[in-house]
Every structure is written in C-alpha cells, then in structure tokens.
Amino acid sequence: MISFIKGVLIEKDPTALLIDVNGIGYEVFVPMTTFYTLGDIDSQVSLYTHFVVREDAQQLYGFKSKVDKKVFQELIKVNGIGARTAIAILSGMDSKTLLHCIENKDYALLATVPGIGKKTAERLVIEIYDKLLKMANEIYAQTSGTTTTSQDSQAQQAPTSVVLANSIFNESVDALLALGYKQKDAEKMARSAMGDATTAAEVIRKALQGSIKSKR
C-alpha cells in the first residue's frame, strides 16, 4: 500500500502527474482541487495517496491533504461511485462544498458531476451523510480557496496569442473529457470559461465552478 508520495514533479497535466521518486516515475491521478495547488515542473511535491488495484489496471490517486484522501475513500465506498467519479466530484467542488451538499441534501448540485444522476446522488447522501459529518471539523479546518502557483502568476502576466488560446482550449477540453464530460459539453464549458484566462487550469476551474453555479 502506497499511502504517501514525495518527489520531483516531472510532468503536470490536468488530472494526471508524473512524479520522480529516487529515479522511479510514478503516475498519479489527482482531482483538479489538488492540481490547482501544485508548483512548477521540477519542484518538490508531496501528496497523500490511495492505491487502487483492478483486474485491468493499478492506479495511484493523490491528494493535497489527508482529509481530501479520507473523503475520496468514503466516496468510493458508495455503491455506483468508482474512483473516476470520485475524482470528478472532488474536481468540481472541494471537501467543504461537498459537505454542504450532503448536509443540505443538494441532489441537483451533486447531479452536475458526470456519471451521477439523481438516484446516485440520493444514494450518495444516504450512505455518506453520517461519515462526512463526523469529519466536519477536519474538513472545516482546511484553509479555503486555492493556492496560486508561480507558474500561474507568470502566465497571468504573459500575452495570450491565438495559438496559445487554442492550446489552452484544447487542453481544457481534454481535462474535462477525462473527468467524464461529453465532448459537446466539454467544449461548451471550456469556451464559456475562456475569457481572458491564460492557463488551462484557470479555464477548467472557471468551467467547473460555472457548472455548479448554473445548478444553484
């Protein structure tokens, strides 16, 4: 069982990282809420991890905090919710927002996540309600908001050319597809979130936040 990983960030794509640990490269899948907090390529990264073994694959999932890892582990215990859907949930909302959804039984907001319909949302609330409430103090203790990396800061100062804009759009669409959104929906979400964004991470964050707000 690999429950924590610390190494050098070699590759950084939305939802997937490559981390060098003493010469061995580990592919780690992460929710966007963790991706937003990452530093530049070649920087040190530390993540709490959960190792999933299936018949056709072995996958490592990483999280910025132990609390997010615990929430992920509770999510995948819910009937009908696998690791991919759990990652999609924690990409569209942080642990605090998820707790609010559970407390308020906000099925409509939960159903904005790809792969979750109303019935699955209702089952999720029923099965995870007590467990998440017990974790409420840990969840609320986490600092709110996301960390702006030096890479994001530098990107915000750089001019956005047509080529760069297309690259950002395509990368954003690919990330949304990886989270389970359909091609048409992913393109629409990315297009509406582009604005003056200068990084794919910024577009993805706005797209996911826009999806949540539209259901409120």
Curated annotation (Swiss-Prot):
Entry keyword set: Cytoplasm, DNA damage, DNA recombination, DNA repair, DNA-binding
Q: Where is this region: Domain III?
A: 164-216
Region described as Flexible linker: spans on this chain: 144-163
Q: Matching InterPro entries, A to Z? A: DNA_helicase_Holl-junc_RuvA_I, Hlx-hairpin-Hlx_DNA-bd_motif, NA-bd_OB-fold, RuvA, RuvA_2-like, RuvA_C, RuvA_C_sf
The annotated region (Domain I) lies at: 1-64
Where does the protein principally reside?
cytoplasm
What Pfam families does the annotation carry? HHH_5, RuvA_C, RuvA_N
Q: Name one GO cellular component term.
A: Holliday junction resolvase complex
* KW DNA repair (keyword) present: yes
Q: Where in the cell is it found?
A: Cytoplasm
Q: Which GO terms describe its molecular function?
A: ATP binding; four-way junction DNA binding; four-way junction helicase activity
Region annotation (Domain II) ranges: 65-143
One GO biological process this protein is involved in is:
DNA recombination
Similarity-based family: Belongs to the RuvA family.
Describe its assembly.
Homotetramer. Forms an RuvA(8)-RuvB(12)-Holliday junction (HJ) complex. HJ DNA is sandwiched between 2 RuvA tetramers; dsDNA enters through RuvA and exits via RuvB. An RuvB hexamer assembles on each DNA strand where it exits the tetramer. Each RuvB hexamer is contacted by two RuvA subunits (via domain III) on 2 adjacent RuvB subunits; this complex drives branch migration. In the full resolvosome a probable DNA-RuvA(4)-RuvB(12)-RuvC(2) complex forms which resolves the HJ.
**Record's function text:** The RuvA-RuvB-RuvC complex processes Holliday junction (HJ) DNA during genetic recombination and DNA repair, while the RuvA-RuvB complex plays an important role in the rescue of blocked DNA replication forks via replication fork reversal (RFR). RuvA specifically binds to HJ cruciform DNA, conferring on it an open structure. The RuvB hexamer acts as an ATP-dependent pump, pulling dsDNA into and through the RuvAB complex. HJ branch migration allows RuvC to scan DNA until it finds its consensus sequence, where it cleaves and resolves the cruciform DNA.
Give the domain note: Has three domains with a flexible linker between the domains II and III and assumes an 'L' shape. Domain III is highly mobile and contacts RuvB.
Q: What is this protein called?
A: Holliday junction branch migration complex subunit RuvA
Protein's organism: Francisella tularensis subsp. mediasiatica (strain FSC147)
